[in-house]
Amino acid sequence: MALYAIGDLHLSLGTNKPMDVFGPKWANYVEHIQENFSRLHDDDVTVIAGDISWGMSLEQSLPDFQFIDALPGKKLLLKGNHDYWWGTASKMEKFFAEHEITTLDILYNNAFFYGDHAICGTRGW
């Protein structure tokens, strides 16, 4: 079991806002994310520290959540300043349950226990 952190995925699988407009370093970045996550195991935990999806609503962000959900391990989501889709924790948990998204948890004014450690999340910007 290992703990990882990444931020600023800026996924746009449900919107037309590709990141490669910001330069060639962003070309095929979704494939690179998938390739690097393939090294993880199902008992690993990844903190995704905000700016997850360019979607403006939960529905518009659904393809991004499904992509992340399909990656190995548990993912803890923190709110970023571009995550306009972010609602209340209960609304998001209900949305995830309705769409059978099972590996994503919200980390916002709560804690997730990882072994002997607690991972806490709140807005820091």
Across the structure, where does each feature detected by a protein language model lie?
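Beta-strand-turn-beta hairpins that frame and shape the catalytic cleft
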Residues: 1-4, 11, 111-124
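Core catalytic region of metal-dependent phosphoesterases/phosphodiesterases
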Residues: 2, 15-115
